[in-house]
Amino acid sequence: LRALEVYRETGETISEHDRKSRETPDRYDALYIGLSFRDRQDLRDRIDRRVDVMVEQGLLDEVQALLGSGLPRDATALQAIGFKQFLAVADGTAAVADAVEEVKLRSRQYAKRQLTWLRRNPDIHWILWEKEPDFPQALQNATEFLTAAGVC
């Protein structure tokens, strides 16, 4: 759909449009700061805990409320990680425990894809966190980076 939209608006294929976009110089000199756990297992554990909290705070109720509001089952919102798996629970075609494990798996896979994509950018200043992030240290690290770049 996006490719068709680009073609209609520009008369270019999506690959041509993307190539030209990459060749165009950036308008601004951007600075990038990335946050990452030093140990990947800590990230996985945090994702798993976050999914557990989402379920405890009513993910299934939220899915049922969306369905009750008349949102079509094929709506984009219901295809998101978490909603898609719990839509099956709401339909009675999946068990809660299975849906929880699937949400955890899909979330970890998504996080891995995000980090893989971000790590291709050599301009990102990475702040590595331990199991329990040290926010004051991260702030100091970011401030030092920005100061050295002439921003602060």
Tell me what each language-model feature is.
Residues 1-30:
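Phosphate/Mg2+-binding loops and adjacent switch elements
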